[in-house]
From Swiss-Prot:
It is found in: Host membrane. Residues 294-346 are annotated as: Disordered. It is a multi-pass membrane protein. This is Putative transmembrane protein ORF346. It comes from Acidianus bottle-shaped virus (isolate Italy/Pozzuoli) (ABV).
């Protein structure tokens, strides 16, 4: 003997829901990498840029011996001055650019952009109810680039905008949670199924033995599920239908089949009331005579059995998904076929 399942009412397959879906919060922001000031390259000088030639002032004898060269150096000061300007500008151009970038350009850019970054970081932290922790200087600015007082001003401005963003995000997170819980509660109510069952097993001296059961499932608000099917995507909200079961088992030397979970229990939906990640998206597979098959990453819900097909041109209907599937039957022009299937929550 096997388990016989009957139901009062039916629910749409998970993949046939459409409409409002739960809102997932923005993931908490990661702390920004602090880009420190670059190492300034070593300054390169030219001996022609010195006022006097090197090594001529060590003694009076060196000075007198090199007097013509010294006079030439003094006479060529104007020309060497122009040479040194060009030399330092060309060979030390990287220092010149870095000085402009990190002392003028970047502070100005960060002054206008950093407050918005602080606001965005505070928004995500507040929305996820994370710890209130304003980050340090964001962008290319650190205390190695600017004087301490300037860095303090930038940090104070960032703290203000972080606080504003945190407050807005916290209030927004409460509304998102309320919205998700309302959708979750509505979908749980309209798709809830209650199963009553009786299972019997017997084994008399190994001669007379058998096991079987009867289950009857009620969907009290299945009519509401049909009304809301195109307005709330309960397949995405729940991931699987919630069910409760009350099954009585009578054992006379045997054991009840696995299709009859003896006792009282409740199987909640696969998805949480407040989603902590991307909601599962159903994958619709077109199958002839069967409609669609729903596959959820977190779904443990079984699928209903498919209807049989006759030997003629007619084909059977498809079983319904949910807690239990009802078998369809089909008839051909010269024959008939029937089949039944049931889906159980894992």
């Amino acid at each position: 003997m096997s388990c016989v399942s009957q139901s009062a009412g039916s629910l749409p397959p998970l993949c046939q829901w459409s409409g409002l879906e739960p809102i997932c919060k923005i993931p908490p922001s990661q702390q920004f990498q602090q880009i420190h000031c670059p190492l300034i390259t070593k300054h390169r000088s030219s001996k022609l840029c010195d006022l006097l030639p090197p090594g001529v002032t060590d003694s009076i004898y060196d000075f007198l011996a090199n007097l013509p060269i010294i006079l030439l150096f003094v006479a060529s000061v104007p020309a060497r001055f122009i040479y040194c300007i060009v030399y330092n500008f060309l060979l030390n151009f990287d220092q010149f650019i870095l000085g402009i970038e990190y002392s003028i350009i970047n502070p100005i850019l960060d002054f206008f952009t950093a407050p918005l970054v602080y606001l965005a970081v505070g928004l995500t932290d507040g929305e996820n109810n994370s710890a209130f922790s304003p980050p340090y200087l964001i962008g290319v600015l650190t205390d190695a680039c600017l004087p301490g007082i300037v860095s303090g001003i930038y940090q104070a401005i960032g703290d203000i905008f972080y606080t504003i963003g945190y407050g807005i995000g916290f209030i927004l997170g409460l509304f998102i949670d309320l919205y998700d819980i309302i959708l979750y509660s509505i979908c749980t109510l309209v798709t809830f199924g209650l199963t009553f069952g009786l299972c019997l097993s017997y084994d008399i001296v190994g001669i007379f033995k058998g096991a079987g059961g009867l289950k009857f499932t009620i969907y009290p608000f299945s009519f509401l599920a049909g009304l809301l099917q195109n307005y709330i995507n309960c397949g995405c909200v729940l991931g699987s239908y919630p069910t409760a079961y009350i099954i009585l088992c009578l054992n006379f030397g045997g054991s009840c089949p696995s299709c009859c979970p003896c006792g009282v229990g409740f199987t909640p939906p696969a998805c949480p009331a407040i989603p902590n990640g991307t909601p599962p998206s159903p994958v619709n597979l077109s199958v002839t005579g069967q409609g669609c098959v729903s596959e959820y990453p977190h779904s443990e819900n079984g699928s209903g059995g498919s209807g049989g097909s006759g030997s003629g041109s007619g084909s059977g209907g498809s079983g319904s998904g949910g807690n239990s599937g009802s078998g369809g039957s089909g008839s051909g022009s010269s024959g008939s076929g029937g089949n039944s299937g049931s889906g159980n929550n894992g």
